[in-house]
Amino acid sequence: MGTTEATLRMENVDVRDEWQDEDLPRPLPEDTGVERLGGAVEDSSSPPSTLNLSGAHRKRKTLVAPEINISLDQSEGSLLSDDFLDTPDDLDINVDDIETPDETDSLEFLGNGNELEWEDDTPVATAKNMPGDSADLFGDGSAEDGSAANGRLWRTVIIGEQEHRIDLHMIRPYMKVVTHGGYYGEGLNAIIVFAACFLPDSSSPDYHYIMENLFLYVISSLELLVAEDYMIVYLNGATPRRRMPGIGWLKKCYHMIDRRLRKNLKSLIIVHPSWFIRTVLAISRPFISVKFISKIQYVHSLEELERLIPMEHVQLPDCVLQYEEQRLRAKRESTRPPQPEFLLPRSEEKPETVEEEDRAAEATEDQETSMS
């Protein structure tokens, strides 16, 4: 009996396919299906396979998410209703006080994520040193690329789109050769101080290896310290001949300097120039541009240097200060006028001298008398 009744019901049911055009099912529209069925009575004894279209169940049973009213009012179902807020204090929300992520947070998120990978192990050196505190421009050595079994520290730098490794263990005693001397003018116009007295002795073992790594250190330091225009103060005083850099080393430095650094160099001040440095620059003219030669300026004293640049942050080595003092002392002695010879008065001459002159005069008179 139940099967026959279900069959009669199905003949009058308008079946609508809800799965043809959409991926997700949607509830059937509420229509008056009960009236067309003539007010069918619910049969509680019907098997689960029958289609129950009684008045109590007018829609197809679907699983849907709970409805949430995403609004800022306190209506029922809203995010600000009592169902979601625990205390009345939580209801006092100012939209202007809501913090939104900025660019810094985004960068921190990217930096901590796994999507970004280093192409190499090149560390980034930060120029946080204050002017003059550049004995080790790359830090205290704790962030080196690695250390070999013999305890050497290495630094990887990129110069001219080429990767180089610097042996910091070998050049650590000579790192004071280049320091930051502050700024001049307006903006970040840096003063780079190069003290030749801190260069290694040519008779030291591994001299060429040290100079090779020291050269890379100087070039990479310039790229770290220079932001805009800059000048180089070359302290040549108190530097013995055995510590003077060779022509080949200077030539290599010039060619390895980036074009931006060469262009932004406004002046090369050579303090206490010697005949050797003048000769080196004269020999180097064929491979040095005319513009670079025009930027060279000779300064013969620290007093003259002080009139050109601010000296607040320029660290002068003790040997350079002593050399300046010796030059000033020698200059004062050379310009001192000669003292006149002291002549004794006639009355203070010795009596023997007077007697000898009297005897000579008497002998002359006797000769004249005898001749007459």
Swiss-Prot record:
InterPro entries listed in its UniProt record: Bcl2-/adenovirus-E1B, CRAL-TRIO_dom, CRAL-TRIO_dom_sf
Residues bearing PTM Phosphoserine: 54
Positions of region (Required for interaction with KLC1): 115-120
SMART domains named among the record's database cross-references: SEC14 (SM00516)
Pfam families in UniProt: BNIP2, CRAL_TRIO_2
Keyword Cytoplasm: yes
Domain of life: Eukaryota
Location of the region described as Disordered in the Swiss-Prot/TrEMBL record: 1-58, 329-372
Record Gene3D superfamilies: CRAL-TRIO lipid binding domain
Annotated site, Cleavage, chain positions: 105-106
One example of a Gene Ontology biological process annotation: regulation of protein localization
Polar residues composition-biased segments: 43-53
Alphabetical keyword list: Cell projection, Cytoplasm, Mitochondrion, Neurogenesis, Phosphoprotein, Synapse, Transport, Ubl conjugation
Involvement in disease: Defects in Atcay are the cause of jittery phenotype, which is characterized by severe truncal and limb ataxia and death due to starvation and dehydration by 3-4 weeks of age.
Protein name: Caytaxin
Lineage: Eukaryota, Metazoa, Chordata, Craniata, Vertebrata
Gene name in the database record: Atcay
